[in-house]
Amino acid sequence: MKLEGKKALVTGASRGIGRAIALALAAEGADVVVNYAGSEAAAKEVAAEIEAMGRKAFVVQADISSNEAATAMVDTVVKEFGRIDILVNNAGITRDGLLMRMKEEDWDAVLTTNLKGVFNCTKAAVKYMMKQKAGKIVSISSVVGLMGNAG
């Protein structure tokens, strides 16, 4: 197992790509923190699948667009696991719509989650990783970064 003993945090891990990443990390030996914004039940299902592989897992609800929430989440990871070795910035939202019809609140929500959320989580994790002199950060982006939607 390539990641035996490593402690990972995956944002947006209750479904989709985040869920698949969390399960893949666990399959390689990592203990995983499953972050979610909405469905605690879905997050707990992912954690149960991880535990069924013989790995440790727990769930943390956090709105990563909030610096305080992101920092508290990473602090919880370190408190529970003693360290953070891997951060996967996966959480993201879409508010697709034509520019002329898009509400400013929708634009702001996308930027604060998809951009500021990555900043918040990375900043919170990197202070521990620097003290450990080790750590990996992976930030996932959407294909929309290459090919935009109509709008």
Predicted regions span which residues?
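Conserved glycine-rich Rossmann-like NAD(P)H-binding loop of the short-chain dehydrogenase/reductase
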Residues: 28-45
